[in-house]
Amino acid sequence: MREILHIQGGQCGNQIGAKFWEVICGEHCVDSTGRYSGTSSQQLELERINVYYNEAGGGRYVPRAVLMDLEPGTMESIRAGPFGGIFRPDNFVYGQSGAGNNWAKGHYTEGAELIDSVLDVVRKEAENCDCLQGFQVCHSLGGGTGSGMGTLLISKIREEYPDRMMLTFSVFPSPKVSDTVVEPYNATLSVHQLVENADECMVLDNEALYDICFRTLKLTNPSFGDLNHLISATMSGVTCCLRFPGQLNSDLRKLAVNLIPFPRLHFFMVGFAPLTSRGSQQYRALTVPELTQQMWDAKNMMCSADPRHGRYLTASAMFRGKMSTKEVDEQMINVQNKNSSYFVEWIPNNVKSSVCDIPPVGLPMASTFVGNSTSIQEMFRRVSEQFTAMFRRKAFLHWYTSEGMDEMEFTEAESNMNDLVAEYQQYQDATAEEYEEEEHDGEEEHA
């Protein structure tokens, strides 16, 4: 019932995805061979395990996951990794050539050749579902495969399953840490697609994750494994309500209804609490007020945009563990009252919370935060400036045009991204009075 089909693409997406499955397996007590190893008498972990797993013969649980890449490297390391044996072997779909950090290769040439084999696997998995709720895609926007082929897959799935939710976990290029020089091109072309074809995008970026590792977790030299662990904690938190019994449940669609006031503005900031360094865990008492306070803290956001520079249109919090819903509601109202200037006043009750009874492994309680803040425009604005600087000189364009792309497509993507920034700005500046006037104008026009 209510299954989610997980798709990971490119090196970044596959590494995040592999970590995510380790976390989910831990929560559902599934060992690395795919068998249930829990001891609890109620077996709560199994009650709705079919959201993410298929039950195969012999009591094995197989992830509903599709893994794709344009080169074999990452796939092979996942296969050799601790949970490599749990995936269905047919669900690894990969090419040999690589996309060379080129969006056009992922979207139009190399990726387009491989896409049909990926769609076959997606169809097979979707047919295995009782009532498919939607898809979750892990990818980065700076490279070639995750961004180019990832967005190609999203648009194809959109055509074939128009009424299913499409949730993405998208790793944006970081402001200071750059992997390749053409990141701004790849990211802008991807955002152009995500605005049109995705329903909900969780925006992540490495720099914010590094900052959390340095400042909060006190890690001296964090690895990608540490960063991916943070992301997977959040991914597990977003869907815990679907996988475990809870007092206030939410699913992908309810999340969307509560978070998206205007269809194009579906890029969210995410956060997770409690984040404590390994050494100081035993000195901290976890309480609902403390979770709430850390969760709303700007330092806790997993993307480099500061919520204090904008206003929240909407937000949603998912709490996990044994706690009183009344206390959760009081704390959330408290946050809104104390920081009312950071919330738009023309959407009353714009913060929702849900509570799930089962905490993550090793913690008594935890919470996940998803916010739709106008300050996310900082991310887009930054990428857009870098894009314009290069595009004005037509730098590196030949890599894209030689794969059959047209300059026009770049211009369209650029203006779509600039429109998005302008829309966020417009709603950031809007006040309740203006909003009412607009309503009246609208009514007069209809009359």
From Swiss-Prot:
Cofactors (names): Mg(2+)
Record keyword Magnesium present: yes
GO biological process: microtubule cytoskeleton organization; mitotic cell cycle
Keywords: Cytoplasm, Cytoskeleton, GTP-binding, Magnesium, Metal-binding, Microtubule, Nucleotide-binding
Subcellular location(s) per record: Cytoplasm, Cytoskeleton
Chain intervals for the UniProt region annotation (Disordered): 428-447
Domain of life (superkingdom): Eukaryota
CDD domains reported for this sequence: beta_tubulin (cd02187)
Family, per entry: Belongs to the tubulin family.
Annotated protein name in UniProt: Tubulin beta-4 chain
Lineage: Eukaryota, Viridiplantae, Streptophyta, Embryophyta, Tracheophyta
